[in-house]
């Protein structure tokens, strides 16, 4: 009873802290003149990280197994993983360009875990025999850490595509405006239009420079976070293969979860390959990473919705790959 109450308190504290952090980010985004709010938001995410850590440890103590055996526990661990990724730039002494992705992701996953699932699904249950293995911690934690990193990296790539396509649409619109002007009005009016555009060149160049810097930072962090996630995913798949051989006598069985994990690994392997080719960097590699965003969610939730395969132990009861 004491552990359950403590878990309940820590859940609501962490959720409230992350909500405040997101509010601070929105305020600083809308009102640039307000300074000094970034540091409290960073401290807030650190506090939320420790609250979720305490929640997982508490659940580990009273359930007597590592809390990764059902959907609720995996979602809380996923939220914890987003909190870790949020602190990565701080460790490397970089500007935190991930906060706009990690904080909403953390609150979304935790919010769904606490409010979107039934109360019965919050209760810890005895592990089924297939999960009673030392590989549970290694395999599932690596997979969920990889999901968190790959989701963040994919969302950064989506943001890069949105900014790039908006820029291209703006350029096409201005070009069409001048082209129409050259045919619809007399030459003097067209020259006046052209002069006005040239007068705004310095302002547009300034905006384009900052847009270029933003896309470069998005590309930089997307590549590094996805590389980290790909490493975790590889370790998770390999450890899962060893566990499968112990449990089922075969390293690979091509059940739905394993198949989609392999598809996920392939998509991000292609992304990393495109990054080695300079001509494919930027938009092309971002498109591949954006496709990976959908693939990850299929891999994470797909088998649980279908309720089939070796990794399925009833609807929404296991997310161990």
From Swiss-Prot:
* Molecular-function GO terms, alphabetical: heme binding
Instruction: Please give the InterPro entries that the UniProt record associates with this protein.
Output: Cyt_c_assembly, Cyt_c_biogenesis_CcsA, Cyt_c_biogenesis_CcsA/CcmC
Q: Sorted alphabetically, which keywords does the UniProt record give?
A: Chloroplast, Cytochrome c-type biogenesis, Membrane, Plastid, Thylakoid, Transmembrane, Transmembrane helix
| Principal subcellular localization | plastid
Please indicate if the UniProt record lists Transmembrane as a keyword. yes
Cell location:
Plastid, Chloroplast thylakoid membrane
**Cited Pfam families:** Cytochrom_C_asm
Reply yes or no: does the keyword Protein biosynthesis apply. Answer: no
One biological process GO term for this chain? cytochrome complex assembly
Superkingdom as given in the UniProt entry: Eukaryota
Query: Where do transmembrane segments lie in this chain?
Result: 17-37, 43-63, 71-91, 143-163, 225-245, 258-273, 286-306
> What is its biological role?
Required during biogenesis of c-type cytochromes (cytochrome c6 and cytochrome f) at the step of heme attachment.
**What is said about its interaction partners and assembly?**
May interact with Ccs1.
Provide the protein name.
Cytochrome c biogenesis protein CcsA
